[in-house]
Amino acid sequence: MFTLKKPLLVLLFLGTVSLSLCEQERAADDDEGEVIEEEVKRGFMDTAKNVAKNVAVTLIDKLRCKVTGGC
């Protein structure tokens, strides 16, 4: 019976350490995911702003051409 306890304790210890390492890696991956989502949101908002600016500039140029008649 004593000869079986040591290997079982070693397996339990190694399993606990392995589980602990997996949880740390999973937590680190979750943190990186949040950063990536923020970057994607920020990138989308920047793109939307740039599109809005380009549309506004184009409309202003067309209005200026119609008002002055010199395009």
From Swiss-Prot:
Expressed by the skin glands. One of its GO terms (cellular component) is extracellular region. Residues 1-22 form the signal peptide. It comes from the Eukaryota. GO terms for molecular function: antioxidant activity. Keywords: Amphibian defense peptide, Antibiotic, Antimicrobial, Antioxidant, Cleavage on pair of basic residues, Cytolysis, Disulfide bond, Hemolysis, Secreted, Signal. Pfam families: Antimicrobial_2 (PF08023), FSAP_sig_propep (PF03032). It is found in: Secreted. GO terms for biological process: defense response to Gram-negative bacterium; defense response to Gram-positive bacterium; hemolysis in another organism; killing of cells of another organism. Disulfide bonds join C65-C71. Transmembrane segments: none annotated. InterPro entries: Antimicrobial_frog_2, Frog_antimicrobial_propeptide. Coiled coil: none annotated. Residues 23-40 form a propeptide. Displays broad-spectrum antibacterial activity against a range of Gram-positive and Gram-negative bacteria. Has low hemolytic activity, low cytotoxicity and low antioxidant activity. Belongs to the frog skin active peptide (FSAP) family. Brevinin subfamily. This is Palustrin-2AJ1. It comes from Amolops jingdongensis (Chinese torrent frog).
